[in-house]
């Protein structure tokens, strides 16, 4: 014989719910007395307080082993990469000469990027260094802080400096300037005490034909040793990265050209297929003309 469970009315359900929330006979709130709730809250307060203290202690111990100025592990930063400016999403520099909006954003980015390189700012913050040698500043047991940096003046970029330039870095005339910079690696002695320079070329034969002629600033794409080593952001507060500007003079219009620039230095490998940015950078250049 099947016994059917009596169906509760809506009023009964509400009354049972109200009694569960607060039972005036037993003085229980949601099934527990005040003392029981106090013990529960005390337990979780102690439990999470202990976890917080353990986490804080662990972080403090770990931070004691980490330098504020130099990364502890740098094995994956042995070879600096190259990057370009203006910075674009896909390393594509596309210029429509007749459309100001297509290149004005590049010009604005370059103006902001090159502002710290103004000669007046460099003269205030940085030193005139002796070229052809590293600018070493050892601590010798005493923290030598902050480190001084060598001047890299905007005027060294010649026709790509943008100073008094009505062509806007050449973008308005279809002869754009692209800036190459080497990523910073702490205590890296670039060039292994030998001169180094940046070279650019088309990636394929057809790219080389369409790339045409170009000039580089400083001359021959040279990067002087005096800008190395780099001691880190906190030590080298006013450090100014050296740049190489490439001005493309007669790129074949309306054709996408693949360009690759490399740093030629004794201790920088540029043939690692696993890291296509190690010592080199590839980008696409297109000059549209109607």
UniProtKB/Swiss-Prot annotation:
This is Sodium/potassium-transporting ATPase subunit beta-2. PROSITE patterns: ATPASE_NA_K_BETA_1, ATPASE_NA_K_BETA_2. InterPro entries: Na/K_ATPase_sub_beta (IPR000402), Na/K_ATPase_sub_beta_sf (IPR038702). It comes from the Eukaryota. The keyword DNA damage does not apply. It is a single-pass type II membrane protein. Glycans are attached at residues 96, 118, 153, 159, 193, 197, 238. One of its GO terms (cellular component) is sodium:potassium-exchanging ATPase complex.
């Amino acid at each position: 014989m099947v016994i059917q469970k009596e169906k509760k009315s809506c009023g009964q359900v509400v009354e049972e719910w109200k009694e569960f929330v607060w039972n005036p006979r037993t003085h229980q709130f949601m099934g527990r007395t005040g003392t029981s709730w106090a013990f529960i809250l005390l337990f979780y307060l102690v439990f999470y307080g202990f976890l917080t203290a353990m986490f804080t202690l662990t972080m403090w111990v770990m931070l004691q082993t980490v330098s504020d100025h130099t990364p502890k592990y740098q094995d994956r930063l042995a070879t600096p990469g190259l990057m370009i400016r203006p910075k674009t999403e896909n390393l594509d520099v596309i210029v429509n000469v007749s459309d100001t909006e297509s290149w004005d954003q590049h010009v604005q980015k370059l103006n902001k990027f090159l502002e710290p390189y103004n000669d007046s700012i460099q003269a205030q913050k940085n030193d005139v260094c002796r070229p052809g040698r590293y600018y070493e500043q050892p601590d010798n047991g005493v923290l030598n802080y902050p480190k001084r940096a060598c001047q890299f003046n905007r005027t060294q970029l010649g026709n790509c400096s943008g100073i008094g330039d009505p062509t806007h870095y050449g973008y308005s005339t279809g002869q754009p300037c692209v800036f190459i910079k080497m990523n910073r690696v702490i205590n890296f002695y670039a060039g292994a005490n030998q001169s180094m320079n940046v070279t650019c070329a088309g990636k394929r034969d057809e790219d080389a034909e369409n790339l045409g002629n170009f000039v580089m600033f400083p001359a021959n794409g040279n990067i002087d040793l005096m800008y190395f080593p780099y001691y880190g952001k906190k030590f080298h507060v006013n450090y100014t990265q050296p740049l190489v500007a490439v001005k493309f003079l007669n790129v074949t219009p309306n054709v996408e050209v693949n360009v690759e620039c490399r740093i030629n230095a004794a201790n920088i490998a540029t043939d690692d297929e696993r890291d296509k940015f190690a010592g080199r950078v590839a980008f696409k250049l297109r000059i549209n003309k109607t």
